[in-house]
A protein has these predicted regions:
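Extended hydrophobic leader/signal-anchor segments used for secretion and membrane insertion
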Residues: 1-112
Length: 112
């Protein structure tokens, strides 16, 4: 019984402080590919240069992009690594889910 309880407790603790999202587009290539799984730390504290997860406006899903600049109130200007220009507007601090801490390159193996 212990062999089951400990891993389940560890996973519950992990997902209390972390989340996971699957990359769906190519805007972060070559850093991340469609199908890759990103684990992120649930915090609004992101720094310029970090890959982060944020909510689209009106709850339309999650986006994985790089933080280009972070303002004094935590608002973030973002950009996909494959994009030549930054995303329009800024991401309000309330929509930031957190920085990516681990990226699992699942998409690179599944697509081939």
């Amino acid at each position: 019984m212990r062999a089951v309880v400990l891993p389940v407790a560890a996973l519950a603790l992990l997902f209390a402080t972390h989340g996971a999202v699957v990359v769906t587009g190519g805007s972060m290539e070559p850093t991340l590919s469609p199908g890759d799984v990103c684990v992120y730390r649930k915090t609004r504290d992101v720094r310029a240069g970090q890959v982060m997860v944020f909510e689209r406006e009106a709850g339309q899903g999650l986006v994985v992009h790089r933080a280009v600049t972070v303002g004094l109130r935590g608002e973030v200007r973002s950009r996909g690594d494959a994009n030549e220009v930054s995303d329009p507007g800024v991401v309000a601090a309330e929509r930031v889910r957190g920085p990516v801490v681990v990226a699992l390159p699942v998409g690179r193996f599944v697509r081939r």
